[in-house]
């Protein structure tokens, strides 16, 4: 649940703090979101669409999400490195009609491209799944752009597997073909225990 002043765990080996997002984080989170989309989807989505992505519009969207009451939105976590937000992850109830309440969803995970490859995505991913597990989830799903091989390889390295479901989403007139991944959390061993208190 975002907006609460709760102490989340740090992983000393990474020097990274994973904590609950707060409304004042919205502008930086929006920049991370837009920058990650532009880098990740370059060559995969029309450049003219990527050029129209607005940090200002995303700031309003994230500020609203971070201000919602518990239970109305997914849990939003930010990753801080040396006091600077470099990532955002959202995890919560599953939005698909063919899943049960024991299956949660990783709604999104975005990392500043300047920090790709340093292991921080792994830490943020771990924190998000710790929250899902602490909430009672037995499994989790996520949707990824089918042609985004970098993201698919990241999730596959973390134990996710495509479950056979595909869908087409639209952003205006831009088509996004997506593939669903699933991960069992039955044997999940939480690594950021303080996050369990915010689920």
Residue ranges of each PLM-predicted region?
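Acetyl-CoA-dependent GNAT
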Residues: 3-6, 20-24, 34-44, 48-114, ...
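Hydrophobic pocket/interface hotspot
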Residues: 29, 33
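Extreme N-terminal starter segment of soluble prokaryotic enzymes
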Residues: 15-17
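C-terminal "cap" of GNAT-fold acetyltransferases
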Residues: 102-104, 138-141, 145-152, 157-161, ...
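Charged catalytic carboxylate motif
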Residues: 28, 123-124, 150
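Active-site acidic-Proline motif in GNAT/NAT acetyltransferases
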Residues: 112-114, 118, 146-147
